[in-house]
């Protein structure tokens, strides 16, 4: 679990390039540097980022153009990181669409962990697109998609192992959570384990 094991993820937002290098040794280079490696980026048709095997080692090339927001660059890097961590064979065209969905989910969970978001929601925070953009440093489209995705998750049937993992993640990021959502007396009296009630509230997120 990268969220728990990474020394470079102690709060949000964080440096995605440092996490990638820490966990894989992969370096990230902008598209301008691609020529140095003999890589023709235009041949891959990706405007944002691409992971390539160069002489036995992987490199993630990304578009560092000024017209692309840093938040979008960060998500694109997380997306390519996801492809690597899940051992996706990107030459397998029949499963490519599935791989894209999985890589998007990987990046979203890394940059905006559902466990942290759910804890913030329990503390009375209104989880809006703007809220995620502000505190997690993500793009408008990534924040919007994250809310839409989490609304579809049914948390009423979490296993004991999943709940334990949730608690570990919330515990690690307690300082960040307390900073943006201090515990109030009303929260202390709230039944945080009433998952059915929480699920009903999530259904009304916007």
Which residues fall in each region the model found?
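Active-site hotspot residues in diverse enzymes, especially metal/ion-binding acidic/histidine motifs
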Residues: 1-206
């Amino acid at each position: 679990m990268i969220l728990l094991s990474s020394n470079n993820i102690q709060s949000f937002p964080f440096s995605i390039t440092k996490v990638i290098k820490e966990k894989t040794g992969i370096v990230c280079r902008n598209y301008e540097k691609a020529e140095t490696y003999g890589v023709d980026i235009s041949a891959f048709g990706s405007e944002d980022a691409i992971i390539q095997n160069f002489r036995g080692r992987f490199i993630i090339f990304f578009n560092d153009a000024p017209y692309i927001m840093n938040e979008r660059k960060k998500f694109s890097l997380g997306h390519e990181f996801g492809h690597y961590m899940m051992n996706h064979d990107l030459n397998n065209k029949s499963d490519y669409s599935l791989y894209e969905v999985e890589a998007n989910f990987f990046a979203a969970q890394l940059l905006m962990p559902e466990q942290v978001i759910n804890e913030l929601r329990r503390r009375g925070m209104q989880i809006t697109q703007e809220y995620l953009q502000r505190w997690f440093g993500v793009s408008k489209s990534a924040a919007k998609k994250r809310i839409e995705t989490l609304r579809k998750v049914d948390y009423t049937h979490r296993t004991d192992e999943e709940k334990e993992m949730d608690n570990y993640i919330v515990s690690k990021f307690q300082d960040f959570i307390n900073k943006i959502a201090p515990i109030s007396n009303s929260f202390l009296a709230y039944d945080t384990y009433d998952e059915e009630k929480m699920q009903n509230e999530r259904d009304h997120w916007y």
